[in-house]
Each structure stands twice: as structure tokens, then as C-alpha cells.
From Swiss-Prot:
A Pfam family this chain is assigned to: THDPS_N_2
PROSITE patterns registered for this protein in UniProt: HEXAPEP_TRANSFERASES
Catalytic EC class: transferase
Classification via CDD domains: LbH_THP_succinylT (cd03350)
UniProt catalytic activity: (S)-2,3,4,5-tetrahydrodipicolinate + succinyl-CoA + H2O = (S)-2-succinylamino-6-oxoheptanedioate + CoA
NCBIfam families linked: dapD (TIGR00965), PRK11830.1 (NF008808)
Protein name (database record): 2,3,4,5-tetrahydropyridine-2,6-dicarboxylate N-succinyltransferase
Length: 274
């Protein structure tokens, strides 16, 4: 694996000079191998190691290089046709392969090659970009989007119209991460490498970026870029220091543990916030 990484790192340093016409065989094969490993889930752009999320920047570099080495081509999408550098993940799937991999895809859901979809996942008409990782038992609901390199945990529900931000550039930026057993409400947006920790519930229409204040009403603490595990979060506002205006924030209205979450429905958690 180190040799593969070295090829990618070296090629990335001279990426401005690489074109589909002049790319060398070693670089092309290395990039294609990485995309294949991302596609199968054998590699992932970010993973939790010793309780901390670690981003493998060289894998992001490989994804970016894939755009340099490939020309646009006509892609058959069943109901439509596309013209892009990245093939569709399911272009050569037959019924046997869908059965083997064990997920369900509802038309016209679109998944780019280099994204991993785990077993027991349901993709309603949605979009999953290259480098993303969608783990077991997750529902990606209608018109939800999973951005490039985003990491979606087990048993997550991304409701209708949810946007999970992608991150290929700037290179140092970390991907957006939704940990296991989270619920993201309709039309919410989680972007810019924000981490929603395990078991959290995000209400409808909540917008979370790195500059968004995430206010815990029980403690008065303000978080940035991270929703603590087990949080129930709704949209809100915080007053300015001079009291003349207020600015948008997200409010943690309560904390729930796995036992409580298992006994109480999502709707009840969101409706009983007083």
C-alpha cells in the first residue's frame, strides 16, 4: 500500500502537467486501483482510529488525479445519458451482482464510481459522489445528496432533500462525517467537514457549517464543527452582544442515550423539546 501511496503522492505534485493523453501507465493504473478500492470499501478517505477521525489525504489526491487522467465520455444512464469523466457505479451491474451486494437502488438514483455502498442500504432517487462511504442499514432518502468523500455511518437516515457536503479541495479539509445511528431531518445541510456524532437527531431545516454556533441550552456551551453524541438539535437564534440583532444558530435542546432513543420515536424526540 505504501508503494501505491508513493505513486499517487509523486503524480499529484506534477498534476498540472498531467493530461489524459500523456499520463504514464504506472500513474493511470495506480489511480484506477485506488478508485476501485474506494468503490469496494476496502479503502476509505476517513476512518475512526483510537476514537479519532483520521483523513487519508493521499486518497483524496487520487480522486482528484482521476479527473486529470480521464476524458469526458458519453455514459448511458438508462432514462438519460451523461457526459462526464467518472463512470456510474452501477453501469455494469446485473441482477446477480445487485443481489450479492445486498442494497436497493430506486431510479433515478445516481452513484459515481469510487463511492462505496454497504449492504442493506436503500438509495431513493438521490446522489452519491465519488469517494463517499455509505455504511450498512442506511437510508438515503429522495433528493438527498452525499458529497465527495463524505462518510455516512451505520443505520443513518438522511431524510428528503438533505445535503451532506463534499470536500476534495482545499486538500487539507476534512470530510463531512455522520456517525452511526443518526437521523438528519429533511432539507438540513451538513457541510465543511462538520462531524455529527453517534446517535444524534437533527431536526428539519438545520444548517451546520464550521462557523455555525451549536448552542447547548442546558450548559450554555457553544460548539463549532461538531455535534456531540446523542444530541437533539433544532434551528434557533442567538442575540448579538449589543442586543440589536440575532444570528442563526443550531440549538441542542436535549441529550438522549441509546436506551432512550430505542424506546422513543424520532418524532417524539423532536416534538417534546420544552
Amino acid at each position: 500500500m505504501q508503494q501505491l501511496q508513493n505513486v499517487i503522492e509523486t503524480a499529484f505534485e506534477r498534476r498540472a502537467d498531467i493530461t489524459p493523453a500523456n499520463v504514464d501507465t504506472v500513474t493511470r493504473e495506480a489511480v484506477n486501483q485506488v478508485i476501485s478500492l474506494l468503490d469496494s470499501g476496502a479503502l476509505r478517505v476517513a476512518e475512526k482510529i483510537d476514537g479519532q477521525w483520521v483523513t487519508h489525504q493521499w486518497l483524496k489526491k487520487a480522486v482528484l488525479l482521476s479527473f486529470r487522467i480521464n476524458d469526458n465520455q458519453v455514459i448511458d444512464g438508462g432514462e438519460s445519458r451523461y457526459f462526464d469523466k467518472v463512470p456510474m457505479k452501477f453501469a455494469d451491474y446485473d441482477e446477480a451482482r445487485f443481489q450479492k451486494e445486498g442494497f436497493r437502488v430506486v431510479p433515478p438514483a445516481a452513484v459515481r464510481q469510487g463511492a462505496f455502498i454497504a449492504r442493506n442500504t436503500v438509495l431513493m432517487p438521490s446522489y452519491v459522489n465519488i469517494g463517499a462511504y455509505v455504511d450498512e442499514g442506511t437510508m438515503v432518502d429522495t433528493w438527498a445528496t452525499v458529497g465527495s468523500c463524505a462518510q455516512i455511518g451505520k443505520n443513518v437516515h438522511l431524510s428528503g432533500g438533505v445535503g451532506i457536503g463534499g470536500v476534495l479541495e482545499p486538500l487539507q479539509a476534512n470530510p463531512t462525517i455522520i456517525e452511526d445511528n443518526c437521523f438528519i431531518g429533511a432539507r438540513s445541510e451538513v457541510v465543511e467537514g462538520v462531524i455529527v456524532e453517534e446517535g444524534s437527531v437533527i431536526s428539519m431545516g438545520v444548517y451546520l457549517g464550521q462557523s455555525t454556533k451549536i448552542y447547548d441550552r442546558e450548559t450554555g456551551e457553544v460548539h463549532y464543527g461538531r455535534v456531540p453524541a446523542g444530541s437533539v438539535v433544532v434551528s434557533g437564534n442567538l442575540p448579538s452582544k449589543d442586543g440589536k440583532y440575532s444570528l442563526y444558530c443550531a440549538v441542542i435542546v436535549k441529550k438522549v442515550d441509546a436506551k432512550t432513543r430505542g424506546k422513543v420515536g424520532i418524532n417524539e424526540l423532536l416534538r417534546t423539546i420544552d
